[in-house]
């Protein structure tokens, strides 16, 4: 199954890397640093040099309303921010990355301050702690589903990774409050191009993650017809 967003954002899919195996570097229930969005966080909150010691240390995931959160936040929360530091010892062996996100309603993810994923219901450009999502999005794992997967290409990985410490930082936003639920559950997986082992085993759901990395370079308006053709030009379906 391939999920394609007609978003106009023109984002490609998985690179043709040769991956020996996958490992998980960050888990949902690891200890993270958490900041509630009652005010704007410092501008460098998603960078590795930020002093996170004033933020709360708590196990993920975070949220309220779905009975699937290890750390509860107030049910009046519009947004919250969380981050976790990890180490890369040999970036040449990390060919690909997938961020697994189970979220309600929207999020933006950063690696050392560089954006690597954004849910399709978040506005483009800069956002602040009061930004609402454009539509709602329900978390899936509490009803037996799987998180969404967001792929980071080999080319982008090469531009980001050197030996040293990294921080994965996430901001989660609610749809127009009051909302019945809010959730952020996060895993970070790496595709390893050798038999070397750097991190931990993958969670059970990982083999079923849908990588939501495909976005068209056009948008579809209300009432327009969508037509699917095969590689030979034959009509497959239309709606």
Predicted regions and their residues:
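Solvent-exposed beta-edge/loop recognition patches
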Residues: 1-21, 135-186, 190-239
